[in-house]
Amino acid sequence: MASNRFDVQLTREAEKDLRRLQAHTGRVTRAILKLEDDPFLGHPLTGSLKGTRALEFSLPGSGVYRTVYVVNDATHVCLVLIVGPHENIYDRAERRVKALRRAGHIP
């Protein structure tokens, strides 16, 4: 029987984002790994980020954070593009998405 679980992968930049969160790495990782069972947990984004999704989660004492990711149904992969505080995340995500699309890594 085929598994319905998705493989959650992080871009190099998203890995750097995660390392910067130091004390919260475990909490953030647990939030992101929820995508293994439900990759559509986050909400779809529009405009220049169409085709990506955003997952919101809170970190005690640090506020609201987001991760922006792409779901590939064919390969059962969730590719995390960015992780960080809500402030300016979509502007930063746009730059990363543009670069990844230009390189042919995401549609």
Residues covered by each model-derived region:
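Short beta->alpha junction loops/turns
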Residues: L21, D38, V83-H86
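A general secondary-structure junction signal
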Residues: R12, L49, G84-P85
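Arg/Lys-rich, positively charged N-terminal/basic patches that mediate binding to nucleic acids
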Residues: M1-I32, H105-P107
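Sparse recognition of residues in long alpha-helices and their boundaries
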Residues: R30, P44, G84-P85
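Enriched for short, Lys/Arg-rich terminal
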Residues: S3-N4, F57-P107
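A short, surface-exposed loop/turn module that caps and links secondary-structure elements
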Residues: L33-P60
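A broad, low-specificity signal marking well-ordered, structured residues that form hydrophobic/aromatic
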Residues: V8, R53, C78
